[in-house]
Each structure stands twice: as structure tokens, then as C-alpha cells.
Amino acid sequence: MDLNFDLYMNDVVEQARNEIEHAGYHQLTSAEDVDQVLQQKGTSLVMVNSVCGCAGGIARPAAAHALHYDKLPQRLVTVFAGQDKEATQQAREYFEGYAPSSPSFALIKDGKITEMIERHQIEGHDVMDVINQLQALFDKYCEER
């Protein structure tokens, strides 16, 4: 029975990874990957992915559809909570002042957190609410592309 559950979870994780990658986000799977991207000048949107229902039903669709906008971050990246633990922990080092939360979004500018959309701002909200929150961050911190 455990084997079937593990196979099922592997499929769920793979689907979640593919969905966010297809939307244009680059997966960061190590602490070094995280530092290499987040220490760069400019803006990076970090999506902290997870297998929970609000990630699949709200956060990932919002992550994809929010990109249909004039102002965008220079880099789109994702870490996977519970899967790529080292990368997720390293990303959270940049989220100063925020508790660990997944799914979530963090906008990093010049290596520093600007603002974060936490799980409580995603769970129980609809996709358009989260898209609007993301695009408000883009308006505030990003340039037209």
C-alpha cells in the first residue's frame, strides 16, 4: 500500500513541477541555485510550490496567468517545499520577516525581500484575487518588458 501511495505522490509532484515550469518558472533545486539567482541585481519572483490543494487550484494558475501583464519581474523561479528542502530553506533565508509558508510568492529585488504573498493570502481566495495581488507587486517593483 505504501508503494502505491509513493507512486501516486511522485506523480502529483511531477505534475506540479511540470505545471509551474510550463508557465515559465525556472526550478531551483539547490541552495547554490537559489543564491546564484536571488543575489543578482533586479527583480525575481519566487513561487514556493507545494502539493496542497490551494497550490494546484489557486497558486499555480495565478502564477501562470499573472504573467499576462505589461510589468514583470526579470526572473521567475520556483522552489518546492517538502521536495527540494535545501533550496526551499535557502530561499526562505531571503524572506526576512516572514514565517515559512507554502504555497507563497516572494518578490526579491537586488537580493532583498520587498513583499510576500503568503498562504493565508492564497488559501480561501480565488485565482483572480491572487493574480491581482501579484500584478500589484509587479506594478510597484517591476518595469515594463
From Swiss-Prot:
GO biological process: cell redox homeostasis
Chain segments annotated as transmembrane: none
Pfam families: Disulph_isomer (PF06491)
Superkingdom, natural source: Bacteria
Family the UniProt entry places it in: Belongs to the bacilliredoxin family.
PANTHER family on file: BACILLIREDOXIN BRXB, UPF0403 PROTEIN YQIW-RELATED
Name the UniProt record assigns to this protein: Bacilliredoxin SERP1075
Organism field: Staphylococcus epidermidis (strain ATCC 35984 / DSM 28319 / BCRC 17069 / CCUG 31568 / BM 3577 / RP62A)
Lineage: Bacteria, Bacillati, Bacillota, Bacilli, Bacillales
